[in-house]
């Protein structure tokens, strides 16, 4: 696990009469921090103020949806659309339950503080990195979508993996590959419509969990494509991806 960034208490800033601008991470927006007692920390990636609940909308909701994307319910995928509807409320409740918080579906200080504990200054979850999700090139270019979109999709994938990791006892999950440019995909014999070229996909090593346990768990954490043992070319890894449609096939795992 990478070290977490040092958090600055807003109450200390207010008490000292100091004014600091929020720190902006590369390619990640930062919300204006409120100096109210409702917010416990100024985060290096993104800081929420107040609370979010059903009916809320905007960038703050979209940022929340990215972090709870791994809690949509079995077989579902949460839309990252900035609209706090019933599906987002349910995802927030599952996130809260997973971390022992009051599961009211309202994102407030306790929920945000837990997210701050789970994310690094580049907005990735603490147990995964952009480098793990891109072993093809350094700039996310050359895929089926823009580099920015591929990178953003990979961020959502990482938060899904973080949720899955927590559900499986917080044991490390081995990521052997993620984003591929069209060239990288061709070089490894990938399918012409592979979701790797969109930044949606990750190939997982067996780790301590085993391929089948990973494939089975992925069904609960927002992955619409799961391929594993028994599916051609997938006896040596478990492939998980988001994106449109749903296709699960790991016959040796009962999927």
UniProtKB/Swiss-Prot annotation:
SUPFAM superfamilies for this protein: Hedgehog/DD-peptidase, PGBD-like
Localization per record: Secreted
The record's free-text note on cofactor binding: Binds 1 zinc ion per subunit.
Main localization category: secreted
Residues that bind Zn(2+): 196, 237, 239
This protein's record includes keyword Protease: yes
Enzyme nomenclature, EC number: 3.4.17.14
One GO CC term on file: extracellular region
Active site (UniProt): 234 (proton donor)
Cofactor: Zn(2+)
Enzymatic class: hydrolase
Keywords: Carboxypeptidase, Cell wall biogenesis/degradation, Disulfide bond, Hydrolase, Metal-binding, Metalloprotease, Protease, Secreted, Signal, Zinc
Function (record text): This enzyme catalyzes carboxypeptidation and transpeptidation reactions involved in bacterial cell wall metabolism. It effectively catalyzes the transfer of the N-alpha, N-epsilon-diacetyl-L-lysyl-D-alanyl electrophilic group of the standard tripeptide substrate N-alpha,N-epsilon-diacetyl-L-lysyl-D-alanyl-D-alanine to water. It also performs a weak beta-lactamase activity, hydrolyzing penicillin into penicilloate at a very low rate.
UniProt similarity note: Belongs to the peptidase M15 family.
Name of the protein in question: Zinc D-Ala-D-Ala carboxypeptidase
């Amino acid at each position: 696990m990478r070290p977490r960034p040092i958090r600055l208490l807003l109450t200390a800033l207010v008490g000292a009469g100091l004014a600091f601008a929020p720190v902006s991470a590369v390619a990640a927006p930062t919300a204006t921090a409120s100096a109210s007692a409702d917010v416990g920390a100024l985060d290096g990636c993104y800081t929420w103020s107040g609370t979010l609940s059903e009916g809320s909308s905007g960038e703050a909701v979209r940022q929340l949806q990215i972090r709870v994307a791994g809690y949509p319910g079995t077989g579902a995928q949460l839309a990252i659309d900035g609209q706090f509807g019933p599906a987002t409320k349910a995802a927030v409740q599952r996130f809260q339950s997973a971390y022992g918080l009051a599961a009211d579906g309202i994102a407030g200080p306790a929920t945000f503080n837990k997210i701050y504990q789970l994310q690094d200054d580049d907005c990735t979850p603490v147990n995964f990195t952009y480098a793990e999700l891109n072993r093809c090139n350094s700039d996310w270019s050359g895929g089926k979508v823009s580099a920015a979109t591929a990178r953003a999709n990979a961020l959502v994938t990482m938060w899904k993996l973080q949720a899955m990791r927590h559900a499986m006892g917080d044991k490390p999950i081995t990521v052997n590959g993620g984003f591929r440019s069209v060239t990288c995909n061709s070089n490894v014999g990938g399918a012409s419509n592979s979701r790797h070229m969109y930044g949606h996909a990750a190939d997982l090593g067996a780790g301590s969990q085993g391929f089948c346990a990973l494939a089975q768990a992925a069904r609960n954490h927002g992955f619409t494509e799961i391929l594993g043992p028994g599916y051609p070319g997938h006896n040596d890894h478990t492939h998980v991806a988001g994106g449109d449609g749903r296709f699960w096939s790991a016959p040796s795992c009962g999927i």
